[in-house]
Amino acid sequence: REGQKKAAATCKLLGLDGIVSIGGDGSFRGLVELAKQGISVVGVPATIDNDIVCTDYTIGYDTAANTAVEAIDRLRDTMQSHERCSVVEVMGRNAGHLALYVGLATGATAVLVPEKEFNFQRDVVERIRLARLSGKTHFMIIVAEGVGSAVEIGKQIHEALGLDPRVT
């Protein structure tokens, strides 16, 4: 708060009309504090998490989503030829927008997001089992970082199904 007070005083000293900030939730929290001190503020949402309320897409989200999809498309070639399971962790501390989009775009076997508590047996093991029954030999699990450790999820898959997942 001391930093915001100093920033507000500096804005007033310099005679600024206001502050424009490009950023995510941390930047927006700072703007709220400046606004409470009478500074006019404008926030431009820019975060790959796409978690700023009242916005459809934030700057950076589309690039992050497309980069992840391209990387997974390349990874899929190896997965298919070696009949592998991959667990891919994407950004998304408190928001699973990126993981969900990437999972849908790549046809993932399962997508785990922080907004929805998951049951490992039902949401991962059973989906892999059903995919196997339908003839699939490779499986993609997308995990938002806020869900927990992708490495641990990979270990659980190994223990439950005997697969040797690659975690990325």
Show the residue positions of the predicted features.
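N-terminal glycine-rich phosphate/adenylate-binding segment common to multiple enzyme folds
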Residues: 1-38
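Accessory alpha-helical/coil subdomains and C-terminal extensions
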Residues: 10, 21-23, 33, 61-167
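Short glycine- and Lys/Arg-enriched binding-loop motifs that mark or flank ligand-binding interfaces
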Residues: 19-22, 39, 45, 56, ...
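Short, ordered loop/turn segments at secondary-structure junctions
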Residues: 24-27, 39, 44-51, 115-118, ...
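Short, well-ordered, mixed-charge alpha-helical segments that flank or form enzyme active sites
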Residues: 27-31, 49-53, 94-98
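Glycine/threonine-rich beta-strand-loop-alpha-helix active-site module
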Residues: 37-74
